[in-house]
Amino acid sequence: MTVRETFRRTKIVATIGPATSSPDMIRQLIEAGATTFRLNFSHGTHTDHHRSICNIRQVSSELNQPVGILQDLQGPKIRLGVFKDGPITLNKGDKFTLTSRQVAGTSEISCITYDTLAEEVPKGAVIMLDDGKVEMVVEDVNVELGDLYCRVVIGGTLSNNKGVNFPNVHLLVSAVTEKDREDLRFGLSEGVDWVALSFVCTPEDVLEVKDLIAASGRNASVIAKIEKHEAIANMEAILSVCDGVMVARGDLGVEIPAEDVPIAQKQLIKTANRLGIPVITATQMLDSMVSNPRATRAEISDVANAIIDGTDAVMLSNETAVGKYPILAVETMARIAVRIEKEQDLKMQPIESMGRAIPNAISQAVGRIAMQLQAAAIVTLTKTGSTARNVSKFRPPIPILAVTPNVQVARRLQMVWGVQPLVLVSLPSARQNFEAALNLAQEMKLLTAGDLVVMSAGTLQDVAGSTDLVKVEFVSSVVGKGLSIGSGIVHGRARVAFHHLDVRDFNQGEILVIDRTDADFIEVIRKASAVITEEASLESHAVVIGRRLGIPVLVGVKNATGFIRDGEPLSINFNKGMIYSGSRTDDLAF
C-alpha cells in the first residue's frame, strides 16, 4: 500500500499521568499513534513532570520520531476547599454558604479559592460545582464577610477541591496566576513545545503569556483553551493572536448551555481552519475507556464528527493519564481517524477571505497540482513550520511531508493535520534539500522510486511565510553505495570511463565513474563534480587527488562501471555514501 493509502492525517494528543509516565508506556503510546503528549500542571510536581519529559525525549530519540510536549497550565481555576469530615451530600433546597474566608468545610459551608468572591458575584447568580453535577443559586451576599448564601437547585455529592464555575458572571481574575508563572518558567527551561493557557477570556491573556515566553529567551507556541463564555464572545480576536486553540468542552459545557457546545465546537474549528492554526478537540472523547476496554458508540461518533468538522487533533485526558486501558484508547482513536478519513470525501477546502497573500496562493496551488497529478506526497521545506501549515489549512487529500532542520519545529508540526515532519540538516540550496528529503523519505518507506511528488519552499531563507516555489519531481531510486571521502550532495551526469581517452570530451561538473584512476585522469578529476571508483582503498590515486583538489570521491562501489550507464543523471549523498538515479524536475517559480 502507498503512504497515501495508509497515512493518518488526524493527530492524537495523549495526557501523561501515573498510568503512562514510564518509558515503556510512552513507547507503546507512540507506537499506538500518539503524536503529542500533554502534561497537566493541575496535578503532579515539577519533579514528576521533569521525569516524564526526560522519558518522552529519550523514547522519541530511540524511535527517531519527533513527538511534541504540551504544557497545560492550571490557570485561575476556582475550587472548593477541604471538607473536614470527608465528602458531603447536598439535597435540593438545602442552604449552603460559599466563603472566601479560610474555614474547614462542612455540610453547610465551604471556603473557595477566590478572595473577591462576594464583591463580584451578584445575588441571583447561578453557580455550578464539580462540572455542573451540583447547582446552586445565590440568594444573598455579605460583602464584609466575603460570603455567598446559596440555595441548592440540583443536589449531589461534593468532595475536596472540586471546581466551581460562575456562568454568565464576569470575574476580574487574571488568566495567569503566580503558580502559572512558576510552572511556565519550569516548562520553558525543560523545552516544552506548546503552552496551553486555561480560562482565556481576551486576546490580552494570550499576549501576556507570549510576552513572558519572549522575555525568557525561550521558544514555545501558545494554545488558547476556550472554556469561558467570554472567550466565545471574543473568539475571532483570541484565535487571531494564538498559535493554536483547544476546544476544552468540560468547563465550556458548564459556562454555556451544554446544547450550545457542539455549535461552539464547529465555530471554533471552522475559524481555526480559516486562520491556519491547529485546533484540538478535547474532554471526555473516550471517557468510558477509563474503566472499560471498549468505547461507547456515542463516543466513537463524537470523535468521528470532530474529525469530519476539521479538527487537527483529538485529545485523551483521563483515558491515558489514569485509565486502565491507555494503549487501547489511543489505538481506538487512531482506528476511528483512519476509518473516517478513508470514508470522507477528502477535497481541497476553500478558505474565505484569503486575500492576495502569495504564500496562501502558492500553498493552495500546491494542493491542487498534487491532486491533479495524483501525487504520492507533497514535500515542503520549512524552517519555521509556516509553509507546511499553509499547505495543511487547505486540507489537500495528499500526505504532506514537512522537512525541517529544526527539531522543535518538527515536534510542533505533530499537531498539524496531514503533516508528517522529517528532520534533516539544512543544505546550501533548495535543490540539495529537496534531494536529501526524497532520499530520507525513501529510507523511511514513505516514498518509493517512481513516485511523483509536488514540492514547495520559500526562496528567502529564514523568512516565515515566504513560500514562493513549486517543484514537480519523480522520486529516484538508490542504485549503489560506497565509502565517502567528502560531504554534501552532488548532482551531475555520469561519465563512465575505462581509459582516459573515453572522457576526452569530459565537461565541467560531470561525475567520473571508473574502476581506478591514474595520472592520466588528473585534468578530468579537476573538472569533475565528483568521482566514483570501484577501488576501495582510502589511499588510492583518486582519493589523494580528490582531497588535493577538493573533489568528493566515493570509493568501493562494486561494479560501478557495469550498472551505471554513461550519460545517466546521478545524485550522490556523500553524507550517507548513497548513489541515486537522476530525477526529472519541473520548476515553477513565482
What is the predicted function of each stretch?
Residues 1-23, 30, 45-48, 54, ...:
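Expand to "…catalyze enediolate/carbanion chemistry for C-C bond making/breaking, isomerization
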Residues 6, 14-18, 169-275, 279-283, ...:
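Conserved alpha/beta-domain cores
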Residues 11-13, 36-38, 66-70, 95, ...:
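Structural preference for beta-strand elements that scaffold enzyme active sites
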Residues 15, 40, 72, 124, ...:
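Conserved, mostly hydrophobic/aromatic
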Residues 16-18, 35-46, 196-199, 245-256, ...:
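Glycine-rich phosphate-binding active-site loops on the catalytic face of alpha/beta enzymes
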Residues 31-36, 189-193, 213-218, 240-245, ...:
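Glycine-enriched alpha-helix->loop->beta-strand junction motifs that scaffold or abut catalytic
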Residues 76-177, 440, 446-501, 505, ...:
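Acidic, glycine-rich flexible loop/linker segments
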Residues 94-95, 236, 269-273, 280, ...:
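ATP-dependent carboxylate/acyl-activation modules
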